[in-house]
């Protein structure tokens, strides 16, 4: 049994004035219990985790299917970002809103005695984080809910690979995972030939999911597993380099195609992200990249484009530049980045860019772009930089993903999930 005193409150994104208002117990005692449950279901996940220590009944709501279903439907969307340092044993969560703050959440991965982590962060979707096995060969993909510490593994991937690129799209009752590239054609050689797609849906047979027939990647594809994939309108998008191109995978058709990116000769550290979406509308695919062109008429910058009409087939789609980093902000960002590249993710209206640093350290800085307000601002320094002290394991360094803390991730129930070990709250100290 966990001790609720060990869970300091996560900084709230709401105003401090509301926190000063006390609840009148004479009112709350007289409220019908169904109404109280309805109110609790409307709370953000961090707020409910703090409140569950108030009484035993609130705690037991965590194991009530009707309550978890209501919370999934009614609780507000939280556009958090998860920074994953493979050797650190925990996530660093950034709340990018106006009162930006950091918090910490333990990772539920099983420990590996006497060696580096056997799984590395690969993707995230709908409150789930995906971790890919490091060993070459047929890959294991683990899905984890860090809040409930629920773990589930997909069936072993059918094609042996070295370091493939992973995409994940999870809904309340479905999971789609793509494992692409780095086919092991021999014990000593890899080629970007194919992709494997796993599909699980509560309405499918079997509901526990299956690996679809492999799909062929476009010729001359060169994938970077750190770049990951974006998902929108039933399609996955990922970057190919040398030269740069955007690969598009239509899940329903099981077919890949190419879309040309803007200014492809002058891109550096490009990343594809999902902008917008959530409960307010469909997500758009966006390209975030540094632009470096020798001509003085095109100064160095970081730009953001969105794609319209980027479907399958003949490589159609039009890119529209929607934002450009201001020169004074870019000067600070370029100094922090130092030519090492940057990690990038988008969640709702927010885009986070984090300069890459030393292997075993968490990010020292993060730049937040609010696309709705067209505003660039630096997040406060991460207070947990020194906690990544488990040696030099995880040579790829940290990754950043869009992450929404959720009490309920019912899609993971489609897999053979392990029982929850314990419930973890979010630590801010």
From Swiss-Prot:
Residues 25-71 form the F-box domain. Induction: Induced by ozone. Residues 1-21 are annotated as: Disordered. Changing residue 15 to P: In PBN6; bigger peduncle diameter due to larger vascular bundles, increased number of primary rachis branches (PRBs) and of the number of grains per panicle, thus leading to increased grain yield. Kelch repeats lie at residues 229-277, 284-339, 350-397. SUPFAM superfamilies: F-box domain, Galactose oxidase, central domain. Disruption phenotype: Reduced expression of class-C genes. Several abnormal phenotypes in the vegetative and reproductive phases including accelerated leaves growth, aberrant panicle distichous phyllotaxy organization and disturbed floral organ identity. Aberrant conversion of rachis meristem to a spikelet meristem after producing several primary branch primordia. In flowers, frequent replacement of stamens with lodicules (petals), and indeterminate production of carpels. Precocious formation of spikelet meristems and prolonged formation of lodicules and carpels. Keywords: Activator, Developmental protein, Differentiation, Flowering, Kelch repeat, Membrane, Repeat, Transmembrane, Transmembrane helix, Ubl conjugation pathway. GO terms for cellular component: membrane; ubiquitin ligase complex. One of its GO terms (biological process) is regulation of DNA-templated transcription. Coiled coil: none annotated. SMART domains: FBOX (SM00256). It comes from the Eukaryota. Pathway: Protein modification; protein ubiquitination. The chain crosses the membrane at residues 72-92, 112-132. Component of SCF(ASK-cullin-F-box) E3 ubiquitin ligase complexes, which may mediate the ubiquitination and subsequent proteasomal degradation of target proteins. Together with FL/APO2, involved in the temporal regulation of meristem identity during both vegetative and reproductive developments in an APO2-dependent manner. Promotes spikelet formation by suppressing the precocious conversion of inflorescence meristems to spikelet meristems, probably via a positive regulation of class-C floral homeotic genes, but not of class-B genes, and through the control of cell proliferation in meristems. This is Protein ABERRANT PANICLE ORGANIZATION 1.
């Amino acid at each position: 049994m966990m001790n609720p005193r060990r869970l300091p409150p996560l900084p709230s994104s709401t105003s401090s004035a509301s926190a000063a208002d006390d609840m009148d117990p004479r009112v709350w005692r007289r409220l019908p219990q169904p109404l109280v449950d309805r109110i609790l279901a409307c709370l953000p996940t961090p707020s409910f985790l703090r409140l569950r220590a108030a009484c035993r009944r609130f705690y037991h709501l965590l194991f009530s299917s009707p309550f978890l279903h209501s919370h999934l439907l009614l609780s507000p969307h939280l556009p958090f970002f998860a920074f994953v340092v493979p050797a650190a044993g925990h996530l660093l969560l950034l709340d990018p809103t106006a009162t930006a703050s950091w918090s910490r959440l333990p990772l539920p991965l099983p420990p590996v005695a006497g060696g580096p982590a056997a799984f590395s962060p690969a993707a995230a979707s709908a409150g789930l984080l995906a971790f890919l096995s490091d060993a070459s060969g047929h890959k294991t993909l683990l899905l984890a809910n860090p809040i409930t510490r629920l773990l589930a593994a997909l069936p072993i991937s059918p094609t042996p690979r070295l370091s493939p690129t992973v995409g994940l799209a999870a809904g309340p009752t479905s999971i789609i995972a793509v494992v692409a590239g780095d086919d092991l054609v021999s014990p000593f050689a890899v080629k970007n030939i194919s992709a494997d797609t796993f599909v699980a849906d509560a309405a499918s047979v079997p509901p526990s999911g299956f690996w679809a027939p492999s799909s062929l990647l476009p010729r001359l594809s060169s994938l970077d597993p750190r770049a990951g994939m974006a998902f929108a309108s039933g399609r996955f998008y990922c970057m190919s380099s040398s030269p740069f191109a955007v690969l598009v995978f239509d899940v329903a058709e099981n077919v890949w195609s190419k879309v040309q990116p803007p200014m492809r000769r002058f891109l550096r550290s490009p990343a594809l992200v999902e902008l917008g979406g959530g409960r307010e509308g469909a997500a758009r695919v966006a390209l975030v990249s540094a632009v470096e062109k020798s001509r003085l008429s095109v100064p160095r910058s970081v730009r953001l484009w969105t794609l319209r009409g980027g479907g399958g087939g003949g490589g159609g789609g039009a890119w529209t530049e929607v934002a450009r980093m201001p020169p004074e902000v870019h000067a600070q960002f370029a100094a922090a980045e130092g030519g090492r590249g940057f990690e990038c993710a988008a969640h709702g209206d927010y885009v986070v860019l984090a300069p890459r640093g030393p292997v075993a350290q968490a990010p020292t800085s993060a730049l937040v772009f609010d696309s709705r307000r067209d505003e660039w601002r630096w997040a406060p320094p991460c207070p947990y930089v020194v906690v990544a002290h488990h040696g030099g394991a995880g040579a790829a360094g940290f990754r950043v993903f869009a992450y929404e803390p959720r009490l309920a991730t019912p899609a993971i129930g489609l897999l053979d999930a392990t029982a929850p070990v314990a419930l973890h709250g979010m630590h801010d100290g």
